[in-house]
Amino acid sequence: MAKFECTDEVTNFLTELPKCEHHLHLEGTLEPELLFQLVERNGVQLPGTFPKTVNELHVIYNNFADLQDFLNYYYIGCNVLLSEDDFFELAWSYFKRVSTQGLRHAEVFYDPQSHTSRGISLEVVTKGFERACAKAQEEFNISTKLIMCLLRHCPVEECMDTVKSAKSLIESGVIDGLGLDSSERPFPPELFVECYQLAKSYNKELQLTAHAGEEGDPSFVTNTLDLLETTRIDHGVRSIEDAELIKRLAAQKVMLTLCPLSNVKLQVVKDVSELPLQEFLDNDVPFSINSDDPAYFGGYILQNYLEVYSRFGWSKAVWAKIARQSIEGSWCDPKRKQELLSEVSEVVNKYVNLP
């Protein structure tokens, strides 16, 4: 439950505070309104049991039982995306929305296998998203990175084929990073070692991350770091259960990309206040605050910041630390990092009366 009031001054400060988003699935920004527009435009047939109206779909989104329940709707939603313009429109809608929320840098996920399995080429999907990223830079000065995710519930051979088909996009740097998502516990990181090694062989500059420690125990995090050689962990909340792992994350500056509202919606915790955010701060484990699949989980990045404030009531200095470590943990170049760090200082100095 909320313990601290988000006053107008707090809300304004958190809105203006420069933000980096590192855990955002572009397909997870598919709002019900756009979903039904694309159904109409593309003549897509949804399952007979699927909600018939925007309001009915919102009710479903407010009551997911767990990760798998959410994923079932997430993959149905992907079926309405067919053309390059569809993918562009989806991502552009996201960038427009967060441009007013202080977002300055976005490293965004997408799931090609959700689309190639329907006969849509990797190039079509990537080009649509790439166009939206370029427009976000041009119109909003939001810098971006594209992270291609492998779906861990798919056969490993199919994941390997996806990496092979992305060879030229990885070599050219259009794809900046490789990630791993979907159902965690049945599909541990050790299954995907060769996929990661192959992708890295295409471009030594390719960044590596993976979902771990959301539903899986801390060993999923440790094995992801050791076997997949990632430099970042997506989610990672259950790392707190392993004291040695916490020391390692702090020492190696492995950033956790945390998603508070997602963790509540998918029953990882009952309330944002139960998340070990203060423990991560106390132990110098770097983390960023992100929205995951905001169309499904009831809040974009600013709402996640506000929800965290309402539970923890952190001072301006703590929020500045979170903003700075989010920038330092980003994959943008040093010049861009310095620009963003300067922006953080400007905003912090502006709110002189805020504790």
UniProtKB/Swiss-Prot annotation:
Its EC number is 3.5.4.2. The gene is AAH1. It is an enzyme of class 3 (hydrolase). InterPro entries: A/AMP_deam_AS, A_deaminase_dom, ADE, Ado/ade_deaminase, Metal_Hydrolase. This is Adenine deaminase. Keywords: Cytoplasm, Hydrolase, Metal-binding, Nucleotide metabolism, Nucleus, Zinc. The keyword Hydrolase applies. GO terms for molecular function: adenine deaminase activity; zinc ion binding. Belongs to the metallo-dependent hydrolases superfamily. Adenosine and AMP deaminases family. Adenine deaminase type 2 subfamily. It holds the Pfam family A_deaminase. Gene3D superfamilies: Metal-dependent hydrolases. It catalyses: adenine + H2O + H(+) = hypoxanthine + NH4(+). Zn(2+) binds at residues 23, 25, 211, 292. One of its GO terms (biological process) is hypoxanthine salvage. The active site is at residue 214. Binds 1 zinc ion per subunit. Its cofactor is Zn(2+).
